[in-house]
Amino acid sequence: MMKVLVVVALLVTLISYSSSEGIDDLEADELLSLMANEQTRKECIPKHHECTSNKHGCCRGNFFKYKCQCTTVVTQDGEQTERCFCGTPPHHKAAELVVGFRKKIFG
């Protein structure tokens, strides 16, 4: 049973990794922003830093590229603004947790 769990976790990790790379490579917005500003590509945005102005500029983590996660913030004046930060999506966190758990058990 443990072997099946490890194989399934490995497959989920590999599929998530390859799909995140494939989706990022195919996004037209990212391609246009990279072509328009070569320096942005070289200077990525670290985890937990603001990415409101450059939603495709997040750095890579240990296994996956961080994703720009946005939320709507309401100021005291009642004005709504969008604030974004680079972070790890929940399904990537789960995959990293499974891989870390596997490393602890099997070395």
Swiss-Prot record:
It is found in: Secreted. Residues 1-20 form the signal peptide. One of its GO terms (molecular function) is toxin activity. Pfam families: Toxin_35 (PF10530). One of its GO terms (cellular component) is extracellular region. Residues 21-41 form a propeptide. Expressed by the venom gland. Disulfide bonds join 44-59, 51-68, 58-86, 70-84. Keywords: Disulfide bond, Knottin, Secreted, Signal, Toxin. It comes from the Eukaryota. Belongs to the neurotoxin 19 (CSTX) family. 04 (U1-Lctx) subfamily. The presence of a 'disulfide through disulfide knot' structurally defines this protein as a knottin. This is U1-lycotoxin-Ls1l. It comes from Lycosa singoriensis. The lineage of its organism: Eukaryota, Metazoa, Ecdysozoa, Arthropoda, Chelicerata.
